[in-house]
Amino acid sequence: MKEFSSPADASNWLKEGKILIHPTEGVWGLGCNASNISACKKISNLKKRSDNKNFILLAPSISCALELSAELEVSQIEFLESVWPGHVTVIMQANNSLSQSLKAGDNTIAIRVSDHLPITNLLNSFNGLMVSTSANISNFPTSNSLDEVKKIFDDPDVAVYAHDNGGALKPSSIIDLKTMEYIRE
């Protein structure tokens, strides 16, 4: 399996429509170019996951994430600025410019602005959105072992962005911005 340490090399892999095992703040992620529908479907197939289950979007900056949202109240923007960058995914209403394939049926997106330097560097080099999901088979536990993840997703279209995960040992918290309720803590 190919491994990249350079954000530019990993970014080029994503631009080719390929899949990347990547570090996050917590568990290993599986990601691709958010605008490449066939790459998104490939991730669903690799994970044995339903096509109608949406992915988390990773944005390179708070301003990029805000550009994807429907109109927000000042208090909502202040909340986002207080949790991002960070290990928090937020569900919010999407604007109309975003592809319907990235939105849930209720026109929402799940989005995060990471504070983990390797993923931030990758997103800045890529200069776009990635979809991301935990690197495990659907409904099975996540693994913190890169070797195990590489065995599970051994495929010629999958490579590794070889940097360490952050210190969190679990997936990100998920908060619904409309209700301010935790979906996952």
Predicted regions and their residues:
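Active-site-adjacent structural elements in enzyme catalytic cores
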Residues: 1-185
